Amino acid sequence: NDVFRNGVAATLTTTDGASRGSQSRNSIGTNGSYFFKGVAQEIITYASDESDNRLSIEENIGGYYDIPLPGLLDENPGAAAAYSLRRLRQAYTGSAIQVQRADNVGGTTDIGFDGYGDLDTAALTTAAAGNSMVVTTWFDQSGSGNNATQGTSANRPKIYDGTTGVIVENGKPAVDFDGGTDTLTHSSDIALAACSIFTTLTAVAAIRVWYGETDQNYLATFSGNVTCTASTSQRNAVHTPSGQTLYNYTRNGSVGGTWYKNSSPLTTTGAQTNQTLTLNSIGGFSSYKHAGPIQEIILYNSDQTDNRPSIEDNVGDYYGIEIAGLLDQYSGAAVAYSLRKLSNSYTGSAVRVQRADNVGGTTDIGFNADGGLDTDALTTAAAGNTMVVTTWFDQSGSGNDAVQNSTAGVRPKIYDGTTGVVLENGKPAVEFDGTNDVLLTGVDFLLRGTFSVAKATGTGSVFGSSGGAEFFRSLNSTQYHFRNNDSIKFTTDTTVQSLLYAANDTTSELAVNGAPAITSATLQTDGFDDFRIGNKSATSTEFLNGNLQEVVIYETNQSIIRAGIEANINFFYDIY
């Protein structure tokens, strides 16, 4: 069981009752021995696990009762500066912006947030009283005090139009910079060696600087490129501005740096050296100014590669920006089986299911709006019956679906007629019975970068090949065995795991839950023939006893981008 207080997971001091089933009492205010003293406003009880819906339920309640909930900076703390038109931190009690009439008549007004943590547009509208309003100060929510201000009325960006109302972009408030004179400047420079900078904006012109200090320190979109310049060293990426976009520039403080657009990496050029990036002006500098809305800028003076999926998902979800899936960011997979959507361009389903008793036809189950398995559609199709997987669709685009045409009880389960959707760590899973469940592909390929999310019990193969010389198996609750020409056995203290197998010119390696597990000096060259999921080989009685959620396989070495792939997987499945 999990307990949350105002959206934050509570630390449980005991696990007593964690496995208890139904509760017999239905009285409010007492359990028969202890009585509640205080006021109660709302109690809602579900007879089902609502983990997937918890955030939306909490947001609804928190918004109505004006209870601040955790924000992006609670989940990913440590920002050097953070400017936004939504509340980013639960403990933040300040305002979002300070505004004044564009004609400089009257005083300033601080505009905060409504109960849902959004900009208080009602207060902004009241302050405007039909006049255009501009931003005098954009408050820093990081706690560092780097408020960005503009003392000259004519150089202030607009937040409210006297004719059309609140400036919005994709339905959310935005600060509109005119591309001419508008800037907001903080008095202290922010110097960044290692850094991650997340910016949500819309560029309406090809050559625009959105954050900078001088012509040697800035972030900008130029014709055909998005650019970071630190001192005299540039890091560019081929890019054409197109509508509302989440940009992220990340570097580790030594060399290089990577540009991401809506979470998808851009091809970078320019060998940026270890130069400090100094910033102090939102909207640009000199004659290089940004034209268009800016909604959020968050700066970290550290490399946030491990937290990037979490930050980008948070931003994308709030602003309605479609964030790139795993295969959009890291393309080229030979096969990809998952119960989440791995690519924004994928239009197929996740699985095809049928009743376990083979009554009725099959039903294709796709994804919900958040990219997870459409468990509502699965529950409807089940109609109280146990459901099994007949096909696990390949999302790589190669058409290598894993199927089981036999109806003789050899299909893995995805829905239990009594307990509902099969789950592992709160996410849907395909359950293999350890006896005879297997999905077949009929495909032969090399394994040079293999990522899987599985929980196995006892001895059983997560996947294998027709001949049985190549497989990945669980030996017991803590030890695993990978074989592909050379055997690699390794031990781990956890059974839910992310696996990497990658071969290069001289060695092969395995990593579990983001950490290297073992390296073999033997290059593993054999290919998997007739790749199968849940079984060691065509003649073996060794089957997977446990749950499988994702298998993504590349035929090329993925060591360089392993950390990014594992961060993506771990963010979704919360493995380690």
Language-model features, listed with the residues they occupy:
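Extracellular glycan-interaction surfaces
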Residues: 1-18, 45, 80, 85-88, ...
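Predominantly extracellular/luminal cell-surface or secreted proteins
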Residues: 4-6, 46-48, 100, 229, ...
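A generic alpha-helix structural signal
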Residues: 14, 19-22, 58, 268, ...
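Extracellular glycan-interaction patches encoded by glycine-rich segments
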Residues: 20-49, 235, 275-304, 488, ...
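Surface-exposed or flexible loop/turn and strand-edge residues in extracellular/cell-surface modules
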Residues: 23-25, 35, 40, 94, ...
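Parallel beta-helix/beta-solenoid repeats that form elongated, surface-exposed shafts/blades used
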Residues: 34, 109-113, 117-125, 216-219, ...
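GGW-centered surface loops in extracellular recognition modules
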Residues: 39-46, 54-159, 168-176, 181, ...
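Surface-exposed, flexible loop/turn segments at secondary-structure boundaries
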Residues: 51, 265, 305, 539, ...
